[in-house]
């Protein structure tokens, strides 16, 4: 019985070490041979950038301005919001003044077109898009000047329907650092491993560039308007429609606004349950990747023997090596470089939240509680309070204002 109790955590340690090494291998293969960026090519088609925005913080201008400074010939920037008094509006107006040569439009999205407010906005924004290539990304993303040239390049191929990107987070404080560490040292390595094993069959919210014809083939954005993991399902349905989704070697930045540990926990539970619905067997298989908890359990059950310490030390070393190579070296995440020591603590917390999220189907999102269906759709649990939005000139529902 004692041998059996030791065998299970030992097997989990071995599978985890194998997984960590495979993640390192996947990262080296993905980044070491930089893909053709298209910077010297003729493939520079017109592109419309679609963003759903809400509120304004100190970084929002710089985030949006990075899309206006692109080394790219023809770009349209469409920014959708739901409230005619949204504080982001003066920021957009400043953007219009600072970049008069840029086609920037703000769109008041007064209609509710699905449970997911981001997709509801994007559906209405898309109606103003002029170009055959659409770029959808979260509002807190910041990019380099060559971003568009590089992410558009794979779409020159007929079989490619979309391109997506990983990101690293710009964090402040310990709570934000934990979230940033999770993204760069746990989530992104899993993305790289999945890409190497089966190809990318999903999208990432940091960037999804899609051919309009591919989007129309899956029924448009309205087909994912009630889903929590809208980015996942957008990419997945494009694959199901017969296209390929390519993971770019571009890594973008995004800001974090986590304010408390409780908010971090609720966010992680939402992520976990969303992943469990999207990839149920893959989510269960994550048990084989939690080397730190397994190594610690083996150390305790072995009574602190030399063998126990060797197994734990080897497992932890492999985990830290993977975190550094993927997070610090390739994703250039400052949190992974400065707080590498916190990765074991993160893994223990992540394992507890993973186990907790194996059951249950409720998620807390944007101030409301939802039931998550088996299909990944959101179903409100708490009634939504009636909100009256007064629309004033120069705004019209789902209409664009340029300058």
Which residue ranges define each predicted feature?
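Acidic donor-binding loop at a coil-to-helix junction in glycosyltransferase catalytic cores
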Residues: 227-233
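Short beta-strand-to-loop acidic/aromatic patch adjacent to the donor-nucleotide binding site
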Residues: 131-142
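Short, acidic, metal-binding catalytic loop of nucleotide-sugar glycosyltransferases
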Residues: 65-74
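Long helical/loop segments within the catalytic core of UDP-sugar-dependent glycosyltransferases
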Residues: 94-127, 131, 146, 150-222, ...
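Cell-envelope/extracellular polymer assembly enzymes that use nucleotide-activated donors
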Residues: 45-48, 76, 233
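Membrane-embedded multi-pass helical conduit in multi-pass membrane proteins
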Residues: 3-7, 11-18, 25-28, 286-364
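N-proximal low-complexity "stem/linker" segments adjacent to membrane-targeting elements
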Residues: 1-65
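Short beta-strand/loop segment that forms part of the nucleotide-sugar
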Residues: 74-84, 105-110
